[in-house]
């Protein structure tokens, strides 16, 4: 095998209001209903894989952060795609917003890193995106962190989460129990006219 490279990016999310729904034992069905705003800024991840046994080294561009979440992302991916475990991974993380400030940066980082690793081995774009949201949701719930950030991020814009759970699940990753709707606004204005006096 040769060295493989992949990149993933995911914006952040600010929750405005929410209700918790964690009554199911199945992590895929846990989450929240609510509303929030998705941001363009978030996390960029660059993955480099080389022959190995599924080890991971995580480097952060600015600052020191806990890398265990990224190890959890890799573990979940190996369960989904065993071939990923045939590589040792280097993951470079670039954060454009602070952590632990309500921006959903753990969800953003989990989605971005999952995308980067899958893209490195050539997983098709849509499958990669859907699986990344599922993996991020499971990692977030196992770590008792985000409840609805991944579902919100799957919609984008100003979002409302109608049903709790992962936005994608199942063997075809075609839908989840989680449902969200995103609204994006585009403002188009006419050029200002200048008049000579």
List PLM regions with ranges:
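Charged catalytic carboxylate motif
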Residues: 69, 73, 112, 187
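Conserved hydrophobic/aromatic beta-strand scaffold that supports enzyme active sites
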Residues: 7, 17, 44-46, 150, ...
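Single conserved hydrophobic/aromatic residue that forms the stacking wall/gate
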Residues: 186-197
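Short capping/connector residues at structural and topological boundaries
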Residues: 19, 40-43, 108, 158, ...
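A short, sequence-level motif marking secondary-structure junctions
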Residues: 63, 166-167, 187-188
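ATP-binding N-lobe of GHMP and related small-molecule kinases
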Residues: 1-100
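Acidic/histidine-enriched ion/cofactor-binding microenvironments in catalytic or ligand-binding pockets
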Residues: 168-182
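Gly/Ser-rich oxyanion-binding loop with an adjacent helix/lid
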Residues: 84-170
């Amino acid at each position: 095998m040769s060295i493989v490279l992949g990149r993933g990016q995911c914006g952040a999310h600010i929750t405005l209001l929410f209700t918790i729904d964690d009554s199911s034992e199945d992590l895929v069905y846990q989450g929240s209903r609510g509303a929030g705003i998705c941001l363009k800024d978030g996390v960029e991840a660059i993955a480099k894989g080389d022959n190995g046994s599924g080890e991971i080294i995580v480097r952060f561009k600015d600052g020191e952060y806990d890398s265990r979440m990224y190890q959890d992302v890799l573990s979940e991916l190996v369960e989904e795609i065993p071939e990923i475990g045939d590589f040792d991974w280097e993951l470079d993380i670039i954060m454009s917003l602070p952590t632990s400030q309500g921006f959903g940066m753990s969800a953003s980082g989990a989605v971005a890193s999952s995308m980067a690793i899958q893209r490195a081995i050539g997983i098709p774009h849509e499958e990669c995106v859907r699986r990344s949201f599922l993996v991020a949701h499971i990692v977030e719930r196992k770590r008792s962190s985000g409840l609805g950030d991944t579902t919100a991020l799957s919609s984008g814009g100003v979002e409302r989460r109608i049903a709790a759970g992962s936005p994608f699940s199942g063997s075809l990753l075609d839908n989840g129990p989680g449902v969200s709707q995103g609204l994006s606004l585009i403002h188009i204005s006419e050029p200002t006219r200048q008049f000579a006096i």
